[in-house]
Swiss-Prot record:
This is Small ribosomal subunit protein bS16. InterPro entries: Ribosomal_bS16 (IPR000307), Ribosomal_bS16_CS (IPR020592), Ribosomal_bS16_dom_sf (IPR023803). GO terms for cellular component: cytoplasm; small ribosomal subunit. Keywords: Ribonucleoprotein, Ribosomal protein. HAMAP family: Ribosomal_bS16. Belongs to the bacterial ribosomal protein bS16 family. SUPFAM superfamilies: Ribosomal protein S16. GO terms for biological process: translation. The gene is rpsP. PANTHER family: 30S RIBOSOMAL PROTEIN S16, SMALL RIBOSOMAL SUBUNIT PROTEIN BS16M. The keyword Ribosomal protein applies. Residues 113-136 are annotated as: Disordered. Residues 113-122 have a biased composition (Basic residues).
């Protein structure tokens, strides 16, 4: 069975992963068939680059992505695009849907960042309140 999975590269405490197509029996950093992308988890935000045409080719030939790679592919919108193609949508409809999807993802990202900053400020206020309340 052929898998699309991560292969670790980089150095100690600074991982960079290659998204590779490999036989399921080969070790994590062992032999592989093709490099189809990269993933940098330490970048802010996480950097994912993929070769969409090669991933589509390998998935059509039966390669199974691992759970982690599947979630990375999903964040790029490739699985949604493939689903639209399988539903028989035209290229114009697919591009319009993908634009809507990207806008929706940008809005979700902004909401998450706003919530994160709100939580940080609330935590700082609570700490300041506890510090002043403890001295009095």
């Amino acid at each position: 069975m052929v898998k699309i999975r991560l292969k670790r590269a980089g150095r100690k405490k600074l991982p960079v992963y290659q998204i590779v197509v490999a036989d399921a029996r080969s070790p994590r950093d062992g032999k592989f068939l093709e490099v189809v992308g990269t993933y940098q988890p330490t970048a802010k935000p996480h950097a994912v680059t993929i070769k969409k045409d090669r991933i589509v080719y390998w998935m059509q030939t039966g390669a199974q992505p691992t759970a982690t790679v599947n979630s990375l592919i999903r964040t790029t919108g490739l699985l949604y695009e493939l689903r639209l193609k399988s539903m028989g949508r035209s290229e114009a409809e697919i591009s319009a849907e993908m634009e809507k999807w990207q806008e929706h993802q940008a809005v979700r990202r902004q909401k998450r960042l706003a919530l994160k900053s709100h939580r940080r400020s609330a935590k700082k206020e609570a700490e300041a309140k506890a510090a002043t309340g403890g001295e009095a």
